[in-house]
From Swiss-Prot:
The keyword Cytoplasm applies. Signal peptide: none annotated. It is found in: Cytoplasm, Cytosol. This is Glucose-6-phosphate 1-dehydrogenase, cytoplasmic isoform. The active site is at H274 (proton acceptor). NCBIfam families: zwf. Catalyzes the rate-limiting step of the oxidative pentose-phosphate pathway, which represents a route for the dissimilation of carbohydrates besides glycolysis. The main function of this enzyme is to provide reducing power (NADPH) and pentose phosphates for fatty acid and nucleic acid synthesis. The lineage of its organism: Eukaryota, Viridiplantae, Streptophyta, Embryophyta, Tracheophyta. Its EC number is 1.1.1.49.
Length: 515
């Protein structure tokens, strides 16, 4: 069955779902299985997210049990001890924190086994079934959530084992869902092959392709900002916007992950998933409703409107010292920096360059969206010298939204200066804990909300955009230029930004408000 045939009716949003509907969705036992339980992703992200949901009483202990599965031969207590330091500070933890962790870890059980053998998965199924029998009521159903914190190379075999041995067996309802992590392939062909292999085992509503950027607070805020504020509606188009930047910067290199990173590079690692998802939310048309399929339909339309990438609108870089890592080949052509211009061929965005930039070992760590507006026509204040209006969404660190605008310089003279209107989340929402991305996305999976997950046709359209460029890099037809660690990246990237029309404000630095 084709992906586009799935239009699952789900809730409009967490906030508008009725208590009755939510109760129906969460009836019965819930078994959460973390495959790859001894790996870094599981220890640093998956289990801490589950713990935070538990603390918020969103994983009731009388319904939920958590299973770790991996090849390592360790006991339940050994896994619990490994996880403990990731859940609570080693020093200074309060008695309440220690008690919460102890109670949570009692819900965690470990099963050891290979990823391609029925024996291990039948043992896992036996353990899950025993939990369901002990915790289920006569009226309840059983729900099974499998989180694959594993390399994509083992997805097909693991999914086959789940399908063969571990599916929900309750006659009273329930479900089986599978969460898979990026990267979803290396190019269009491998992504489609992976999608086909998983798609032969599970239907699209059972598959949750997780991209943690879609769980970030300000990424989720994009739809609200765009479609719930009237003053943006007439401005959000090529008549008023000159260019859009989507930026991901890290101030550290590969840090011991050189061998792994070299297989993918900065483009595969960041751009077709995280940054392209952000682009979709910036550029999409208003969906018919907040139902997941309506939102994802609009995102696919954006992706299918992106023109082929031009070689002269790409700058690749590799920081000096990258190949000093013994796990990286001396002649590696892998980029650690990339700036590319994407152009959307539709009525709203014709002529507006979307500048997508990602890099490692740069002079700062941040992720942000910068929407730069055109110059004021007939400007009587000569404010062009001060810089353009920009709407900036800071995704990390120090989540914030601010608008750069020109105002009168305080004093006796009529002179203009650039300032900002800003919303700093740390200042405005003191005392409110902003959930981590994985918390939101795991909860969405439990609730059956696929709004913030990648559909198969989205994945295909994303790879169609970048596969030709990636193949040219793989063949050595495009080569990265060297840049100094701790710099802005290659000078050629700044030249490309200027060519695309981005105007830098000289000397302007946004300073987050202090608490």
């Amino acid at each position: 069955m084709g992906t586009n045939e799935w239009h699952v009716e789900r809730r409009d949003s967490i906030g508008t779902e009725s208590p009755v509907a939510r109760e129906v969705l969460e009836t019965g036992t819930l078994s959460i299985v973390v495959l790859g339980a001894s790996g870094d992703l599981a220890k640093k992200k998956t289990f801490p997210a589950l713990f935070h949901l538990y603390k918020q009483e969103l994983l009731p202990p009388d319904e939920v049990h958590i299973f770790g599965y991996a090849r390592s031969k360790i006991s339940d207590d050994e896994l619990r001890n490994k996880l403990r330091s990731y859940l609570v500070p080693e020093k200074g933890a309060s008695p309440k924190q220690l008690d919460d962790v102890s109670k949570f870890l009692q819900l965690v059980k470990y099963v050891s086994g290979p990823y391609d053998s029925e024996d291990g998965f039948r043992l896992l199924d036996k353990e899950i079934s025993e939990h369901e029998y002990l915790k289920n009521s006569k009226e309840g159903s059983s729900r099974r959530l499998f989180y694959l914190a594993l390399p994509p190379s083992v997805y097909p075999s693991v999914c086959k084992m789940i399908k063969t041995c571990c599916m929900n067996k309750s006659d009273l309802g329930g479900w089986t869902r599978v969460v898979v992590e990026k990267p979803f392939g290396r190019d269009l062909e491998s992504a489609e092959e992976l999608s086909t292999q998983i798609g032969e085992l599970f239907e699209e509503p059972q598959i949750y392709r997780i991209d943690h950027y879609l769980g970030k607070e300000l990424v989720q805020n994009m739809l609200v900002l765009r479609f719930a504020n009237r003053f943006f509606l007439p401005l959000w188009n090529h008549n008023h916007i000159d260019n859009v930047q989507i930026v991901f910067r890290e101030d550290f290199g590969t840090d011991g992950r050189g061998g792994y990173f070299d297989q993918y590079g900065i483009i595969r690692d960041i751009i077709p998933n995280h940054l392209l998802q952000v682009l979709c939310l910036i550029a999409m048309e208003k969906p018919v409703s907040l139902k997941p399929e309506h939102i994802r339909d609009e995102k696919v339309k954006v992706l299918e409107s992106v023109l082929p990438i031009r070689d002269d609108e790409v700058v690749l870089g590799q920081y000096e010292g990258y190949t000093d890592d013994p796990t990286v080949p001396d002649d590696s052509n892998t980029p650690t920096f990339a700036t590319t211009i994407l152009r959307i061929h539709n009525e709203r965005w014709e002529g507006v360059p979307f500048i997508v930039k990602a890099g490692k070992a740069l002079n700062s760590r941040k992720a942000e969206i910068r929407v730069q507006f055109k110059d004021v026509p007939g400007d009587i204040f000569r404010s062009k010298k001060q810089g353009r209006n920009e709407f900036v969404i800071r995704l990390q660190p120090s989540e914030a939204i601010y608008m750069k605008l020109t105002v009168k310089q305080p004093g006796l003279e009529m002179s203009a200066v650039q300032s900002e209107l800003d919303l700093s989340y740390g200042q405005r929402y003191q005392g409110i804990t902003i959930p981590e991305a994985y918390e939101r996305l795991i909860l969405d999976t439990i609730r059956g909300d696929q709004q913030h997950f990648v559909r198969r046709d989205e994945l295909k359209a994303s790879w169609q955009i970048f596969t030709p460029l990636l193949h040219k890099i793989d063949r050595g037809e495009l080569k990265p230029v060297p840049y100094n660690p701790g710099s802005r990246g290659p000078a050629e990237a700044d030249e490309l930004l200027e060519k695309a029309g981005y105007v830098q404000t000289p000397g302007y630095i946004w300073i987050p408000p202090t608490l």
